[in-house]
UniProtKB/Swiss-Prot annotation:
Name of the protein described by the UniProt record: SUN domain-containing protein 1
GO cellular component, one term: chromosome, telomeric region
Domain SUN: 751-912
Gene that produces this protein: Sun1
Tissues where the protein occurs: Widely expressed. Expressed in cochlear outer hair cells (at protein level). Seven isoforms are expressed in testis including testis-specific isoform 5. Isoform 5 is the only isoform expressed at the end of sperm differentiation. Six isoforms are expressed in muscle, heart and brain, four isoforms in kidney and three isoforms in liver.
Length: 913
């Protein structure tokens, strides 16, 4: 802002009612100055500027002395003699540098103002007059801002110079206050010298000014701002909690030091009482000298007097030096603080890395979206593949969490987390304190570093100890008579204080002697039971003697009789107590013996029962063996009789009746089992051929007559029509009854189910069952439910990876398992001609609950690939416990390296009543 050319104007003294009104003290919005100049026919002071509210400045004036005012008048007269052109080219900064510096009210400290006001009457100081226009006040309210942005002016001033100007004002006021008191210390003289230099320096640079500018709109706050704000709140909260914990540790350590000092205090009391007596005489001798000291000399330190401000600074330095020597507990607390700081820094780094990871994830998502836009087919295939594998992994993870984490480890994890929660809070305590030297001074909320050190126990709290004072210089002669009453009062106070100290020393010595006597008596009492009894007897004896001197002789005899009776009663009670003790010991011994016997009997009882059971079984076996011997002899006799009878029957045809001849004769009339099986197989083939031929010719089902004729044509006679119907019906019934004729309690349609959370991983093929534009949409795979469904055909099975797997089945009801059926397709139906994926060795376990890790074994079996496709396996014995959950554990297969197939698994048994 370009201000109009301005110079100071002083109206002539001859003008009537000259008020010294100048344009500098008027507003740019009034015409009073123009009217004043027109009325008195004065030369215009300066051109009227075009001012706005942005260019308004705060104008203040400082107090001037008479010499300064004369200098200003001379300067004014000089400036009036200069031509108008020179006045126009002169800048505002040059004119202000030539005048007396004026500093802003905002730079003037409250302390300097109060001091100058309080000493105005004594020192005849001219107070500063602040001239501010109401329009300027409104501008200050509306235009002031805290953003570091300057606009609308071309003379900003020097901020550093402004600070120096403020120092100058404070220094002048401090010097004036010190001179008004009539006393100046060394530090204040140094301050005065410094302010003189600053005054000269500030006169060169000129006055300062405050800039008022319009408020600007703040920039929009992003996500990083709020994240930093959240981190700051977390830091401050953790720091506050850590400060509380550390301060609590400090209080505990101070309490421990208090107890230690208390123990040491009792040992040093005797020595201190003697030293206090010696020091008391020295204090009396020193009292005379202190009584003659002046009030100014009592506040001297190292031979120099100090004012109140210097005393406060000196006390602060001593206090800081005292706190710098921290004891061992403070060092321990500091070490803990540094540990918390290091941990907090690691936590901050972890949060920053997490934020960086989030940013990288966002970039990855953006790249995936761009890929979807550029190559939709490839992106769709990758997305479906990723979703499928991700869904399977998610289900597996949930199953693992449900089985292992939530059911087994959740309670332990909760307990450990509760224990680690305070440690985690402590670890986050030093987030904002890394790299600082003093831990306690940086605590934001509970900053208790200014606490006074705890007073030791051996220090006397209720009295002033006389101590050696530093040697004071000879007193200076003061000619002011007003200080003599103060010196006399101070001497009286010191004398009374010394007397009180002496009295306290005497009382402390007496208390120390009494404490020593009491300690001796306590040591005597602590020597043992004999010392205690002796002390009690002495006290009782003294009391009895006193009572004997006071009471009459009758009372003494009564007391003696009462004492004798009391002793007799005590002796009786001791006898009874001794007897009770003996009886209780005997009872205790008997009780221990009975417990030992009972324990041994409890251990021997199962063994005895087992031995008795074995003896009974042995007797039973002996009786059965004797019966078998009798049966053996009877069988031998029967065999001999039969042999004789056969020989007699065939003795007519055979000479000698040998057994070999009999066997040859029977084999000629009968056939063996193998020959019968071959004949039956041929008969079945012939029957099937005849029935097939009949159906192809007639197109109808065969009748009973056709079946009989087919049997006759096959060359086998002796089978009637009814027998043929029975054979066919039995075969059809067995096939319709699930090929076993027994109830399958694992069948899904009958109420069975699969616990998929404990089954093995399904083996998935890479062949897509459904695809769209070459993108696979659905892969074929069977679930474990196929194992308990009745449909069996090649490929309709559950395959799991490897040769070992698990299958857990929940039965329709609780049963006593007795039989298990394993079914696989035959080799004739296999495309490869073998069934290497069939299970070989497997075991079955009974489980009480689905969370049980190891169940009760029900049997271990082997499936034969060369046998029938449906094979049944029986348990060795009926289990004692009923189960509703059965686990099939496949241990090996017949050689397939990648997977194992299960087609059908049945469970048979007896339901519980």
């Amino acid at each position: 802002m370009d201000f109009s050319r301005l110079h100071t104007y002083t109206p002539p003294q001859c003008v009537p009612e000259n008020t010294g009104y100048t344009y500098a003290l008027s507003s740019s919005y009034s015409s009073d100055a123009l009217d004043f100049e027109t009325e008195h026919k004065l030369e215009p002071v300066f051109d009227s500027p075009r001012m706005s509210r942005r260019s308004l400045r705060l104008v203040t004036t400082a107090s001037y002395s008479s010499g300064d005012s004369q200098a200003i008048d001379s300067h004014i007269s000089t400036s009036r003699a200069t031509p108008a052109k020179g006045r126009e080219t002169r800048t505002v900064k040059q004119r202000r540098s030539a005048s007396k510096p004026a500093f802003s009210i905002n730079h003037l400290s409250g302390k300097g103002l109060s001091s100058s006001t309080s000493h105005d009457s004594s020192c005849s100081l001219r107070s500063a007059t602040v001239l501010r226009h109401p329009v300027l006040d409104e501008s200050l309210i509306r235009e002031q801002t805290k953003v570091d942005h300057f606009w609308g002016l071309d003379d900003d001033g020097d901020l550093k110079g402004g600070n120096k100007a403020a120092t100058q004002g404070n220094g002048e006021l401090a010097a004036e206050v010190a001179s008004s008191n009539g006393y100046t210390c060394r530090d204040c003289r140094m301050l005065s010298a410094r302010t003189d230099a600053l005054t000269a320096h500030s006169a060169i640079h000129g006055t300062t000014s405050r800039v008022y500018s319009r408020d600007r709109t703040l920039k929009p706050r992003g996500v990083s701002f709020y994240l930093d704000r959240t981190l700051w709140l977390a830091k401050s909260t953790s720091s506050s909690f850590a400060s509380f914990i550390v301060q609590l540790f400090q209080v505990v350590l101070m309490k421990l030091n208090f107890e230690t000092y208390k123990l040491k205090g009792y040992e040093s009391r005797a020595y201190e009482s003697q030293s206090y007596e010696t020091k008391s005489h020295e204090s009396e001798a020193h009292l005379g000298h202190c009584g003659r000291m002046t009030a100014g000399e009592l506040s001297r330190v190292d031979g120099e007097s100090l004012c109140d401000d210097c005393k406060g600074k000196k006390h602060l330095e001593i206090h800081t030096a005292t706190h710098s020597q921290l004891p061992q507990p403070h060092r321990v607390a500091g070490a803990m603080g540094r540990l918390c700081i290091y941990t907090g820094d690691l936590l901050v780094q972890a949060l920053r890395r997490t934020r960086a990871a989030g940013w990288s994830v966002a970039e990855a998502v953006w790249s995936v979206l761009w890929l979807a836009v550029s190559a939709p087919g490839k992106a769709a295939s990758g997305t479906f593949w990723w979703l499928g594998s991700g869904w399977y992994q998610f289900v597996t993870l949930i199953s693992w969490l449900n089985v292992f984490l939530l059911t087994r480890c959740l309670r332990n994890i909760c307990k450990v987390f509760v224990l680690l929660l305070p440690l985690l809070l402590l670890l986050g305590a030093g987030v904002s304190l890394w790299g600082q030297g003093n831990f306690f001074s940086l605590l934001p909320v509970l900053n208790w570093t200014a606490m006074q050190p705890t007073q030791r126990v051996d220090d006397s709290k209720g009295m002033h100890r006389p101590g050696p004072l530093p040697p004071s210089p000879p007193p200076k002669v003061d000619h002011k008579a007003s200080q003599w009453p103060q010196e006399s009062d101070m001497g009286q106070k010191v004398a009374s204080l010394s007397a009180q100290c002496h009295n306290h020393d005497e009382r402390l010595a007496e208390l120390t002697v009494l404490l020593q006597k009491l300690q001796i008596r306590v040591d005597q009492v602590d020597d043992g039971r004999e010392g205690l009894s002796l002390w009690v007897k002495n006290v009782v004896g003294q009391h009895l003697q006193e009572m004997g001197t006071i009471e009459p002789p009758d009372a003494k005899t009564d007391f003696m009789t009462f004492h004798h009776d009391h002793e007799v009663r005590l002796s009786n009670l001791e006898d009874v107590l001794r007897k009770l003790t003996e009886k209780s010991e005997a009872i205790q011994k008997e009780l221990e013996e009975t417990k030992l016997k009972a324990g041994s009997r409890d251990e021997e009882q199962p063994l005895l029962d087992r031995v008795q059971h074995l003896e009974l079984e042995l007797n039973l076996l002996k009786s059965q063996l004797s019966d078998w011997q009798h049966l053996k002899t009877s069988c031998e006799q029967a065999g001999a009789r039969i042999q004789e009878t056969v020989q007699l029957m065939f003795s007519e045809d055979q000479q000698g009746g040998s057994l070999e001849w009999l066997l040859e004769k029977l084999s000629s009339r009968f056939v063996s089992k193998d020959e019968l099986q071959v004949l039956l197989h041929d008969l079945e083939l012939k029957l099937l051929q005849n029935i097939t031929h009949h159906i192809t010719v007639t197109g109808q089902a065969p009748t009973s007559e056709a079946i009989v004729s087919a049997v006759n044509q096959a060359g086998i006679s002796g089978i009637t029509e009814a027998q043929a119907h029975i054979i066919v019906n039995n075969a059809l019934k067995l096939y319709s009854q699930d090929k076993t004729g027994m109830v399958d309690f694992a069948l899904e349609s009958g109420g069975g189910s699969i616990l998929s959370t404990r089954c093995s991983e399904t083996y998935e093929t890479k062949t897509a069952l459904l695809s769209l534009f070459g993108v696979p949409l659905w892969y074929f795979s069977q679930s474990p439910r196929v194992v308990i469904q009745p449909d069996i055909y090649p490929g309709n099975c559950w395959a799991f990876k490897g040769s070992q797997g698990y299958l857990v089945v929940r039965l329709s009801m609780k049963i006593y398992p007795t039989t298990f059926t394993m079914e696989h397709i035959p080799k004739t139906l296999s495309p490869t001609g073998n069934i290497s994926s069939a299970p070989k060795d497997f075991a079955v376990y009974g489980l009480e609950t689905e969370y049980q890790e190891e169940g009760q074994p029900l049997g271990r079996f082997t499936y034969d690939q060369e046998g029938d496709s449906l094979q049944m396996f029986h348990t060795l014995e009926r289990p004692d416990q009923a189960f509703q959950i059965v686990e099939l554990r496949v241990l090996s297969n017949w050689g397939h390296p990648e997977y194992t197939c299960l087609y059908r698994f049945r469970v048979h048994g007896e339901p519980i009543q």
